[in-house]
Amino acid sequence: MTGVSVISIDREEQPNGPRYIADLQGLEEDFPMKLTDYKALTFDCYGTLIDWESGMMEGLKPLTSKLGTALSRNAVLEAHARHESAQQEQTPGKRYRDLLPIVYKRLAEEWGLGVTWAECVQYGKSVRDWPAFSDTAAALQYLKKYYKLVILSNVDNESFSFSNQKLGVSFDAIYTAEDVGSYKPAPANFKYMLDKLKSLGVTQSEVLHTAESMFHDHKPANAIGLASCWIYRRHNDQGFGATMNPGEMPKYDFRFTSMAELAKAHQEQLRA
């Protein structure tokens, strides 16, 4: 895989989280792709465009407020990731808004707390309230001028419809876990997307998959040779938050800490 930001990656643990060091040897010989070479940007939504971690923490307050000893934000998110990932694997056809109540119940059980099913269901509805990152809408509006914009998300259609109102653009295509019948990182989700994109006149080599999650997005993208752009939203934090640890770190072709940085880099390449 070639790229602008990195060719190969070594991981070193640092006090503020993982540090990634690019080995740029041979960069020119590899004729790396530029952002301007792609025809479509395919986005993970939650964690990349929507601040799902803040939304989760707000939605979990009725539960976490009952804890005798407060847990750190990362401890809560990591527990959520464990239960969510396990449930998605066990029931891949269950809609996300119906899966989240089970996650809420599992968290309550892990923490020894009593909850009603009504509380669990309410958490499943909280996706509609999860906020967009402050830079998302403006960046998407800029990128829309140059790319087909596509969503590949691990949610259900109804939940995404609420989030979509906060994103500021009309997407050329939206593919959800409900449509596919499975959750990322399942290969089926990426195959579904790439097959559908052919009808829009877009081939895999023209796609840049843009996402925060190494586990849900970059690892499966690596497996099929799909170019990817890492939006490293957690660059000031430790660990993987609301996503599972991917194990060996996947590679990526571009890295930015925000959508605003991605849009700025595209502008700079146009001027070059």
Regions found by a protein language model. Give the residues of each.
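Cationic, low-complexity basic patches in intrinsically disordered or flexible, solvent-exposed regions
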Residues: 14-15
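Conserved strand-to-helix beginnings and helix N-cap segments that scaffold or border functional pockets
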Residues: 53-54, 137, 186-187
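Asp-based, Mg2+/Mn2+-dependent phosphohydrolase catalytic module
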Residues: 2-10, 20-41, 115, 141, ...
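N-terminal helical cap/lid subdomain that shapes the substrate entry/recognition surface
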Residues: 34-134, 145, 158
